[in-house]
């Protein structure tokens, strides 16, 4: 739960005292995704302080190998109403299926290193997971924020890459990744570096 849970009650009590709030001034917690889970938990843990919570898309129970969100991503990539198509979703699936096979051989790893301009060859199991996770983020974040952030890629944008008939799905994915992720720099897929960044709680 991190530091947010224990800090929350202290902050609420401080605000109540600072502004002379009473029991008629109720607290409602709001959140979506991980913050949504926090809003649900804080209501359960501190019912005497939090009157209610609105927890949107809140994963309050850990599930191993959770694929639910990727199913939502696939559905969005398939939906013309948001800029997707069946061809787009199929090509994305084909690209990842091919990558799964490529990482099993040295020749395939060399191909991935060159196509995706990785900073180092993807060889360890953890670095491979980080690599695939980085690729997945292209689609997950785009679906989550589709048409919400000005200037950010949309589902239509990424599908225009993935449905380019002049290239194969993996090459299209590499071009998309270069555009959205690496932007000319090498692609860092170090599991150790990724974890170090997550553990730095004082980063800006």
What are these regions (language model features)?
Residues 1-19:
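Alpha/beta-hydrolase active-site loop
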Residues 3-4, 31, 199:
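Short amphipathic alpha-helical molecular recognition features
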Residues 15, 37-40:
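Eukaryotic intrinsically disordered and solvent-exposed regulatory patches
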Residues 16-22, 51-52:
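Substrate-binding/catalytic groove segments of enzymes
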Residues 21-34, 38:
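Alpha/beta-hydrolase fold nucleophile elbow
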Residues 41-204:
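Alpha/beta-hydrolase
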């Amino acid at each position: 739960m991190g530091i947010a849970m224990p800090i929350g009650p202290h902050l609420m009590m401080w605000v109540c005292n600072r502004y002379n709030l009473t029991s008629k001034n109720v607290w409602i917690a709001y959140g979506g995704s991980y913050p949504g889970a926090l809003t649900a938990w804080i209501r359960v843990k501190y019912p005497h302080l939090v009157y209610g919570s609105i927890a949107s898309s809140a994963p309050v129970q850990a599930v191993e190998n959770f694929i639910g969100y990727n199913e939502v991503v696939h559905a969005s990539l398939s939906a013309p109403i948001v800029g997707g198509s069946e061809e787009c979703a199929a090509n994305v699936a084909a690209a990842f299926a091919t990558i799964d096979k490529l990482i099993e051989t040295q020749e395939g790893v060399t191909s991935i290193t060159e196509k995706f301009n990785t900073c180092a060859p993807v060889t360890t199991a953890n670095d491979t997971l980080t690599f695939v996770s980085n690729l997945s983020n292209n689609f997950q974040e785009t679906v989550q924020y589709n048409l919400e952030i000005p200037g950010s890629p949309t589902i239509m944008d990424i599908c225009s890459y993935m449905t380019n008939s002049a290239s194969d799905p993996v090459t299209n994915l590499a071009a998309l990744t270069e555009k959205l992720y690496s932007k000319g720099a090498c692609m860092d897929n170090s599991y150790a570096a990724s974890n170090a960044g997550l553990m730095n709680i004082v980063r800006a």
